[in-house]
Design a protein with these regions (language model features):
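Positively charged n-region of N-terminal signal peptides that target proteins for export
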Residues: 1-4
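Bacterial N-terminal signal peptides
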Residues: 7-15
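Active-site beta->alpha N-cap acidic-glycine motif
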Residues: 19-108, 114-115, 187, 191
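Solvent-exposed loop/turn segments at secondary-structure junctions
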Residues: 33-37, 61-64, 79-80, 86-90, ...
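Alpha-helical scaffold elements lining the catalytic groove of polysaccharide deacetylases
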Residues: 42, 88-113, 122-168, 181-187
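C-terminal domain-boundary segment and adjacent tail
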Residues: 49-50, 64, 180-230
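Residue-level detector of anion-binding/catalytic polar loops
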Residues: 53, 79, 139, 146, ...
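Structural detector of well-ordered beta-strand residues that form the stable sheet scaffold
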Residues: 55-57, 81, 119, 141, ...
Length: 230
């Protein structure tokens, strides 16, 4: 009887798609430059319908414009990180001005929201940015997949670039600033979920991989740690 059950179990496993037997991996979706009005709301609707949590790197001046959207991002369980107040290139700023970009944004965040990531606009980092991030106990967030959706407004092209490049542990850079970006993001989710991929916030992805986030250090992805040689 036991041998029969084992044979049945093996047959079932062989009959299942690969994604059903084992998840292809975990990825984190990140959205820069928001919040916006309609676009972010539509994105949040789509994420909610799909049960997906994402990480939003917000600009202070946009939080001031859309405090209700910011509150919704936070209340629906998404992660919030800093993207500066004014979206200036932080490589060109003094340490004092970099700190102000962070502090002025922090003052506008929902009560209880304490970001752990800073993503400098354009990914433009410098020693000064790293020093301020370290002093503010912030890790620097990079990315490993970038379809450049801010300049490429063809939804199918953005989707194809992401799907052709994505690997386990990737951090995907997108924006919630246009219809095409929102549509591409939701299409990407639909395809990857169908294949068995799971979506996490960046902090969740780091924890799953056992990564200790260090202030001032940059993280572009969180792949599965390599097994030690036998």
């Amino acid at each position: 009887m036991r041998r029969f059950l084992a044979a049945v179990a093996a047959a079932v496993c062989l009959a299942l798609p690969a994604s059903a037997a084992q998840s292809p991996g975990y990825v984190a979706l990140t959205f820069d430059d928001g919040p916006s009005g309609r676009f972010t709301r539509e994105l949040l609707d789509g994420l909610y319908d799909r049960g997906v949590k994402a990480t939003f790197l917000l600009c202070g001046y946009r939080i001031r414009q859309y405090p209700d959207v910011t509150q919704r991002i936070y209340e629906e369980g998404h992660e919030i990180g800093f993207h500066g107040y004014s979206h200036k290139n932080m490589k060109n700023l003094s340490r004092r001005d970099i700190a102000s970009e962070i502090l002025d944004t922090e003052a506008l965040l929902p009560a209880g929201c304490h970001p752990v990531f800073l993503r400098p606009p354009g990914g433009c980092c410098s020693d000064s940015v790293r020093q301020v991030a370290q002093a503010r106990e912030l890790a620097i967030l990079g990315w490993s997949v970038d379809p450049r959706d801010w300049e490429n407004h063809d939804t199918a092209s953005v989707e194809k670039k992401v799907l052709s490049q994505v690997h386990d542990g990737d951090i995907i850079l997108l924006h919630d600033m246009s219809d095409s970006s929102v549509a591409a993001a939701l299409e990407i989710i639909d395809v990857l979920q169908e294949e068995g991929w799971e979506f996490l916030t960046v902090s969740e992805l780091a924890r799953r991989r056992g990564a200790e986030l260090r202030p001032g250090r940059q993280y572009d992805k969180f792949p599965e740690p390599e097994s030690p040689p036998q």
